[in-house]
Amino acid sequence: MVKVANKYAKALFDVSLDTNNLETINEELTVINEAVKDKIEQLKMVDSNPTQTAEQRRELINGVFTDINPYIKNMMYVLADNRHISLIADVFKAFQSLYNGHYNQDFATIESTYELSQEELDKIVKLVTQQTKLSKVIVDTKINPDLIGGFRVKVGTTVLDGSVRNDLVQLQRKFRRVN
């Protein structure tokens, strides 16, 4: 189903670029994703209900999403017609990936053993942008006492691990190779 969601996201992304609505559509899609992310199971039930017609699913879209961008509404109609309303979170994720790629930015999760100061965060973000060659990094911070010290950054599939725990694991591996 991820491939299906990617196709919807790509179509919406292309339309948003062609019509100079990329920012608006991204913002509205973010709000929609937040609104439905806890309702995916209910949406799956709507998708799988054989007694519900496409028109009824469209009415549901109209009732819930009254004042949204017409391109998003059209995509939602297509999702409803094809019994894919529950894919909206996957569509959002794929759209976000295209959006981030367009602007050469990505999300980063910075883990540390304590709450980092703004100065420390700025230094880490600068390091991450240099290492990943991204224009912008959107940061989410988490406290992880298992790191013992230092920090670990996850950007997409890349992990930059400057934690004491990682140093100890690396040291342990070296000792095992020697013995």
Swiss-Prot record:
Membrane topology value: Peripheral membrane protein
Any GO molecular function: proton-transporting ATP synthase activity, rotational mechanism
Cellular compartment(s): Cell membrane
A matching Pfam family: OSCP
PROSITE patterns: ATPASE_DELTA
Coiled coil ranges: none
Predominant localisation class: membrane
UniProt keyword list: ATP synthesis, Cell membrane, CF(1), Hydrogen ion transport, Ion transport, Membrane, Transport
Gene3D superfamilies per UniProt: N-terminal domain of the delta subunit of the F1F0-ATP synthase
GO cellular component: a single term: plasma membrane
Subunit structure: F-type ATPases have 2 components, F(1) - the catalytic core - and F(0) - the membrane proton channel. F(1) has five subunits: alpha(3), beta(3), gamma(1), delta(1), epsilon(1). F(0) has three main subunits: a(1), b(2) and c(10-14). The alpha and beta chains form an alternating ring which encloses part of the gamma chain. F(1) is attached to F(0) by a central stalk formed by the gamma and epsilon chains, while a peripheral stalk is formed by the delta and b chains.
Family: Belongs to the ATPase delta chain family.
Cross-referenced PANTHER family: ATP SYNTHASE DELTA CHAIN (PTHR11910)
Purpose of the protein: F(1)F(0) ATP synthase produces ATP from ADP in the presence of a proton or sodium gradient. F-type ATPases consist of two structural domains, F(1) containing the extramembraneous catalytic core and F(0) containing the membrane proton channel, linked together by a central stalk and a peripheral stalk. During catalysis, ATP synthesis in the catalytic domain of F(1) is coupled via a rotary mechanism of the central stalk subunits to proton translocation.
Protein name: ATP synthase subunit delta
Organism: Staphylococcus aureus (strain JH9)
Gene name linked to the record: atpH
